[in-house]
Regions:
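Topology signature of small-to-medium multi-pass alpha-helical membrane proteins
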Residues: 2-147
Length: 147
């Protein structure tokens, strides 16, 4: 068995898919260093966050959020952006999955953290944008037939 990022069948990449690719690159580039900082210092002090914010949550520290942030919202977004550029058949599906993941991540953050910042709402909108682009991308390529 051989794994390859090269698609067997290149899917159409409509112009609007570049919106998702750009959002994935920006999100990934911003998420990786923050995730690494949370992993390096799970108290959040390195990021200037009060320890009381996370101690009262089910996580107890920023370690698990840091791993998710660096792995899924960081490396995952960058990897799927590459798949989108390469017109891999899975790119629209994974774009949708990461959009839903980002929405979930932000909603959990809104529910458990005592304060939000403008980036919270920007990334919530980014998650919805990824989801909608994925939906129309799948529709355009014929991989999803809803209407």
């Amino acid at each position: 068995m051989q794994l390859s990022l090269a698609p067997r069948v290149r899917v159409e990449r409509p112009r609007f898919a570049w919106i998702a690719i750009a959002l994935q690159v920006v999100t990934g580039v911003l998420a990786v260093p923050v995730g690494i900082m949370f992993i390096a210092d799970p108290s959040g002090a390195l990021m200037g966050l009060p320890p009381g914010w996370i101690e009262a949550t089910p996580f107890g520290s920023y370690l698990v959020p840091g791993v998710y942030l660096a792995g899924v919202n960081g490396i995952g977004m960058l990897a799927v952006a590459v798949l989108g550029v390469r017109r891999h058949w899975s790119a629209p599906w994974l774009t949708g999955a990461l959009g839903v993941g980002l929405i979930t991540w932000i909603l959990v953050q809104i529910l458990i953290m005592p304060e939000t910042m403008i980036l919270t709402w920007v990334f919530l909108a980014t998650g919805f944008a990824l989801g909608f682009v994925a939906l129309f991308w799948l529709r355009r390529t014929g991989q999803l037939r809803l209407w």
